[in-house]
Amino acid sequence: MARRYMIDSILYWAQEYHIDGFRFDLMGLYDVETINAVRAALDTLPGGRDILMYGERGRAATAAAPVRGQQGESCHAERSHRHLLRRHPRHHQGRLFHAREPGYVEGRPGSFWDIGGAVAAWCRSDRLPPHAPSQIVSYVSAHDNFTLWDKLLLVRYEKPEFTAADSTALAQNRLAAGIYLTSFGLPFLQAGEEFARTKKGRATATALRLR
């Protein structure tokens, strides 16, 4: 029933509202058969094969039944250039849960080879199952965790001023964009990243209040 509801809803949005892309949160919660069924249903629509479909690889802390798709594997079940897995380790800016840890753009020693793997969409790496470059989404920041700008400043300063211009951080911001925009795979840009968007050092936006 849940699978049918998902398929019917997505087909309705695609047909009635002409939505041409779908992003699945916590895609690891869904079983592979359901995700492939959604893809197959979209492909039956006029122009449906051009509709983008990708998802977050995680599944959060859950006690869901073991029938769910394996984390990081759901989108590899069907080899399709439209069936993308949002997994591009963010070595550009260090580990995302460690605010002070530098990445390649902040000059972390020994990180060059990590960047080499990321630029090539890990096609020659054993970190992921065999895949096409187009099955990888390349990005450095998203709605979760720190913005790129905040991460850059947190690495550089003990008490950063997030709204102040910083020429080094601006150059690092451009370098990060240059890397993933020219990498293999589908580039993903968080809205506002191009003008140094800040959440003032917060890892999430839940604590922010609209004024």
Residue spans for each PLM region:
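Active-site neighborhood of glycoside hydrolase catalytic domains
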Residues: 1-65
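Conserved alpha/beta catalytic core and glycan-binding cleft of carbohydrate-active enzymes
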Residues: 39, 49-206
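Acyl/amide activation-and-transfer machinery of modular secondary-metabolite enzymes
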Residues: 208-211
